[in-house]
Curated annotation (Swiss-Prot):
This is DNA-directed RNA polymerase subunit beta N-terminal section. In L.terrestris the gene for this protein is split in two. It comes from Pleurastrum terricola. Belongs to the RNA polymerase beta chain family. Keywords: Chloroplast, DNA-directed RNA polymerase, Nucleotidyltransferase, Plastid, Transcription, Transferase.
Length: 1142
């Protein structure tokens, strides 16, 4: 066989490119896609929020080389860090959190796990989508059976909706012409009942099902006495009414004074059939966390059903079920052919990168559950220093990228009330509310028994479809004091029925949608505010308001927000004129409410007493921000995050008055601009503001700001300005009278050991300086700044250091660590504040601390730095468990990855008998594994050769025995596209001339074109042969798997080489065309068992591809430039290159 290529410029790609490209796609795209699931987690009861900045993830390069990992029996992996923002009630922090260790692929295309090289095989699985199939009865000889024939000899038609992750759904028409829905571990469901549950009315269902025989509802009746559809539907309605009566009776039977009434109500609602059905439908098909079609599956469904649903909507819709049923009935009526499930277009390849991505997704789901459990069940006082008392048993919510909330509380109603269909017709969404409505409920305290009674009444009303929102019912009942007597409740109930919203159906062209249009009379505004008299200075309270999402006149605020902002600024500048001329921008009703309730009054804060020095700094910083606000001073030259925080703060702080009483300086009050969404501002919020302003003042004292480069990214977000000032501690040499501050700060991403040691000669600021040790050394140069004190640790004395003593180190600069001096002359800081900053530094640089402790200990012994207290450093190391470190552990992701490499059958020890065995092992494709085929039950159809395998899967190389046909190898030119489908190259043929450019076609596209084999002879100008007669000018070709002869001018594509149809191992067999197929199969397998020679020799008979296999296996040294080898020894190899310029 001649292995020549028609275009010599088309070279064979890297034989390990399948593995390398897949892992590269994981690092660039797949990892970010999985980390975006960690958007943020919030617990509103405990006022805790975790925000994951998934797009800014970082890797630390492995500390060891692959060779060292094998020798030391370690895993060649890289640490994955992600910035996480932690927000509590009174504290905020941004931390680099270690999520886990991702095993890295070597240049040779394999992994090293515990010192052992391992390979993750590619897996061939069924492509997600919709597939139609027919199972004929063996007794039925003729397939031409009418659809009206009700005999048992008719075939069974069914279609499978296969997702990438989730439950398989089968639509089936049995021999009795009944349509069913089938799922695993669930009894079959009638199609009509399933469509009604999805929100379709009988008119749509009758329009869908052409024949009346498809409307059989005999599943509710006795099969021996079938009835028509009308009687069956009547029985359905009767049973539903009976269930409604039984539920009302169960509610009436409950004792109103029973303290456990809430549990009983939840149990009754949980065991109700419609509620369970909502849970089942949502979790099975409409929840993105448990069901995923993938963009490929959505594309296949849209193509077969002629839909236009966006590709990013990867869950099922009611339209998919409706039109899939319609297409199934059409195929059953016309007796259409079923889909070919062995076609390569219905199979896709899961490469190692995708398998790793799936395991990472499972690990992230476990991590979310772990975080939520810790937030709900752990005492978080040790996480947040100033946190208030927390309650146990609260619920948390996960906010995904599409802003869909999945509440993790077991008794939550969210899963039932958020079906994307008409099935949740009791739920009212906020966007359907009428304009100008809002509800603000009174916050009256009731005893437990009264609350249970109100809850029972509200549930009765909800079930009777009288009201929509349970919170509104309770608020309405509380405001009316309905528990006093029964007559008042009856009057209220009659009044409420008259005011309740009626159901108004709005149908579109298809008649599939409906919604509720409520009346605005049922919503009331009853704020209960403890207003503060601005003139009395005895008591300072906060304005507290319960504003729901519907908010304070939402439509009014949207239209008049700018005018309100202008008016508020006028009020803030002149506090005495609160609501003068408000009628010009507000309606009369809103004006009256504002005058009575004072919605938009200023907040008055009573902060705690603070030290005089810090308050002076606070006052200076506020004055500076005021200058920036009124354009009296230019904005500071900080990075984007700092500018954002300054602009955010200057819009709220307008005035800060300072007063001294009893030798104590306190902040009397601060005017703060109100917000419309959340008006109340906690008192402890002031401490965060204080810390921000103190830190900002350090940079403002000199009138200039530090010009931080883009390299300082995540550590300086929002509040981390203090990281610029002090990230570590000063180390002074007791023997050196002129101390040189040395930075021991290193990069999070290490470069090499020599560079780390080179940075040890730079120093930084240390808190709690031992003044008795440093007094003699610092007296000469800092006598005017430091006072003598015998106390080794003076907490009250602020440490003052000159600007030449302070340097900044940047850990995120691409060029490495560099120093930058502060511009300001001096700065003030208390020892306690510097200690906090030291702890923040150690939290984010745990790896650095572990590496540098040994170096510092050696320096102490050599340079006699005896004043360093190792006990204190160890305490800092033990205190590294920050709020995020306690909530987020690496066990979830590391455990999921260990399952892939340790338990998954697709992860195998790398075959290292010879270079060919290694290359073949890395390119292998297996149909077995999780989600694949079981070799004990695999039929011959799965194992056999399909026409679409040409140029994509080798028909020769496959194992012998049970795995025959289930484990294959791709051909030498095949590649995997972005969607996981195999492609093979072809040359375009234009009017009988072969073009130079190659086109990669998948199996579905190739089936549409006229393709010729690659062994046709052609002229020097790449023209196909043209004979004198018509017969001689015809060439063989195939289209749609049919072979025939056709004129050369009608050919559209041609193969590139005879080598295109076989794999790498098969291409090394000489004279393959003269070999028997069975012997060629055994020969391709036995080549991988050959033991390599100690002294390499060229083969006596070869095909010319042996050198390429050796080169891509990385067993030999390769030069980057071509040339002539002039010298070889056991120490060096000299290659002489030739350049045209020389």
């Amino acid at each position: 066989m001649e292995f020549s290529v028609k275009n010599k410029n088309l070279l064979i790609q890297n034989l390990v490119e399948i593995q390398q490209q897949s892992f590269n796609e994981l690092l660039c795209v797949g990892l970010k896609r999985q980390l975006l699931q960690l958007n943020f987690i919030e617990n509103k009861t405990r006022n805790i929020k975790l925000i994951f900045h998934a797009k800014n993830y970082k890797f630390i390069l492995p500390e060891i080389t692959p060779k060292e990992a094998v020798l030391k029996s370690k895993t060649f992996a890289s640490a994955l860090f992600i910035p996480v923002e932690y927000r509590a009630k009174n504290s905020i922090g941004l931390y680099w959190v270690l999520l886990g260790h991702l095993p890295f692929m070597t240049k040779r295309g394999h992994f090293i796990i515990n010192g052992v090289p391992r390979v993750v095989l590619n897996q061939m699985v069924r492509s997600p989508g919709l597939y139609y199939k027919t199972t004929a009865n063996p007794q039925n000889v003729s397939n031409q059976v009418s659809i009206n024939d009700s005999s048992h000899t008719s075939p069974v038609f069914y279609s499978d909706i296969i997702p990438n992750r989730g439950t398989w759904l089968r639509l089936e028409i049995d021999r009795k012409k009944n349509i069913w829905i089938r799922m695993k571990r669930v009894d079959k469901i009638p199609m009509m009942l399933f469509l009604q549950a999805l929100g379709y009315d009988l008119h749509c269902i009758e329009k869908l099902l052409y024949s009346r025989k498809f409307l059989n509802c005999d599943y509710l009746l006795n099969t021996d006495h079938p009835a028509d559809s009308n009687s069956a539907l009547k029985k359905i309605k009767v049973e539903i009414e009976q269930q409604k009566v039984l539920k009302l009776a169960a509610l009436e039977a409950l004792d109103d004074d029973d303290p456990d009434i809430a549990k009983q109500l939840d149990y009754i609602e949980k065991t109700t059939t419609p509620e369970m059905g909502k849970d089942f439908l949502f979790q099975s098909f409409f929840n993105p966390a448990s069901y995923d079609l993938s963009p490929i599956g959505r594309f296949q469904l849209n193509k077969k059903l002629n839909l236009s649903i966006p590709s990013d909507y990867t869950v099922l819709t009611e339209f998919d079920i409706y039109f899939a049923t319609k297409e199934l009935i059409k195929r059953a009526t016309t007796m259409s052919n079923s889909d070919d499930i062995d076609h390569l277009q219905t199979r896709r390849i899961r490469s190692c990168g995708e398998l790793l991505e799936i395991q990472l997704g499972e690990g992230i789901e476990r991590l979310q559950k772990t975080i939520i459990d810790k937030i709900n069940n752990t005492n978080l006082k040790k996480f947040a220093k100033h946190s208030s008392t927390y309650k146990r048993g609260t619920s948390s919510s996960i906010y995904r990228q599409d802003r869909q909330v999945i509440n993790t509380d077991k008794n939550s109603k969210f899963l039932k009330n958020n079906l994307p269909t008409k099935f949740n017709r009791i739920t009212l969404e906020p966007n359907l509310l009428p304009n100008g409505t809002s509800f603000i409920h009174k916050n009256n305290k009731l005893n437990q028994v009264s609350s249970n009674k109100l809850k029972l009444l509200s549930k009765k009303l909800i079930y009777l479809n009288l009201l929509i929102n349970q919170k509104f019912i309770i608020a309405k009942l509380k405001s009316a004091n309905l528990l006093a007597n029964k007559s008042s409740f009856d009057k209220f109930l009659i009044h409420l029925v008259d005011e309740s919203p009626r159901q108004k159906f709005v149908k579109n062209k298809t008649g599939l949608y409906h919604k509720f249009i409520p009346t605005p009379e049922i919503y009331i505004v009853e704020p209960n505010l403890n207003l503060v008299d601005m003139k009395s200075q005895q008591k300072f309270n906060l304005l507290k308001m319960d504003l729901y999402k519907v908010g304070l006149a939402e439509s009014f605020l949207k239209s008049n927000l700018n005018n309100l902002n202008i008016y508020l600024q006028m009020c803030l500048r002149k506090p005495n004129t609160y609501f003068r001329d408000i009628s010009k921008i507000c309606s009369a009703q809103i004006t009256q409410q504002l005058k009575q309730k004072s919605f938009l009054k200023l907040l008055l804060i009573n902060p705690r007493l603070i030290s005089q020095n810090n308050l002076l700094v606070l006052n200076r910083a506020v004055n500076f921000l005021k200058k920036i606000q009124f354009n009296l001073k230019d904005s500071p030259n900080l990075n984007d995050y700092q500018n954002f925080e300054i602009n955010k703060l200057k819009a709220h702080i307008f005035k800060c008055q300072i007063k001294t009483q009893n030798n104590l300086t306190c902040c009397k009050y601060i005017y703060i601009k109100t917000k419309f969404n959340y008006i109340n501002l906690p008192i402890k919020q002031f401490f965060f503001t204080k810390r921000f302003l103190i830190t900002e003042q350090k940079l403002l004292l000199g009138g200039k700001f530090i010009n931080s480069n883009l390299a300082l990214t995540s550590l300086l977000k929002l509040h981390k300005f203090s990281e610029v000032v002090s990230n570590s501690f000063l180390i002074y040499n007791a023997n050196n009278p002129n101390p040189n501050p040395t930075s021991i700060m290193s990069m999070i991403r290490p470069v090499n050991k020599s560079e780390i040691y080179r940075q040890l000669n730079r120093r930084f600021v240390r808190s709690r300086l031992q003044l008795n040790v440093l007094k003699s050394e610092l007296t000469n140069s800092h006598s005017q700044l430091i006072k003598a004190n015998n106390d080794p640790i003076d907490r009250e004395l602020s440490i003052q250091i000159l600007k030449q003593d302070v340097q900044k180190s940047n850990p995120f600069n691409k060029k490495g660590i560099y120093n930058q001096r502060f511009i300001n002359k001096k700065f003030l800081d208390t020892s306690q504040f510097i200690d906090q900053e030291l702890l923040h530094f150690l939290k984010t640089h745990k790896i650095f601390l572990d590496r540098q402790l040994t170096s510092l200990k050696t320096k102490q012994q050599n340079e006699k730095l005896k004043f360093i207290k190792w006990k204190k450093l160890r305490n800092f190391k033990n205190a590294l468990k920050n709020p995020i470190q306690n909530l987020i552990t690496t066990n979830a992701i590391n455990g999921a990855l260990q399952e892939l490499f340790g338990l998954n059958p697709l992860s195998q020890f790398m075959d290292q008998i010879n270079p060919l065995s290694e290359i073949t092992h890395k390119r292998r494709i297996s149909s077995m594994g999780p989600g694949g085929v079981n070799r004990d039950n695999a039929s011959m159809d799965v194992r056999s050769i399909h026409p679409t395998h040409y140029g994509r899967i080798c028909p020769i190389e496959t194992p012998e025995g049970h795995n025959a046909g289930l484990v294959n190898s791709p051909t030498i030119y095949a590649r995997i596209n972005n969607y996981g489908f195999l492609e093979t190259p072809f040359f375009k043929v234009n009017s009988g001339q072969i073009q130079a450019k190659a086109f990669y076609l998948n199996a579905q596209k190739e089936q549409k074109f006229k393709v010729s084999p690659p062994d046709l002879s052609c002229s020097e100008l790449q023209f196909l042969p043209l004979g004198p007669t018509k017969i001689e000018s015809e060439v063989p070709m195939r289209k749609d798997f049919k072979f025939q002869r056709m004129a050369a001018t009608q050919i559209e594509f041609i193969g590139i080489s005879p080598l295109q149809m076989i794999s790498v191992a098969t291409s090394l067999i000489p004279f393959l065309e003269h070999d028997d197929a069975n012997r060629a199969l055994m020969g391709s397998n036995m080549q991988r068992q050959a033991v390599p020679l100690l002294i390499a020799e060229r083969p006596v008979v070869g095909t010319g591809l042996e050198g390429r296999v050796i080169a891509d296996s990385s067993y030999i040294m390769q030069t980057k430039q071509s040339g002539v080898i002039s010298y070889v020894s056991n120490e060096q190899v000299i290659v002489q290159t030739f350049h045209l310029n020389n």
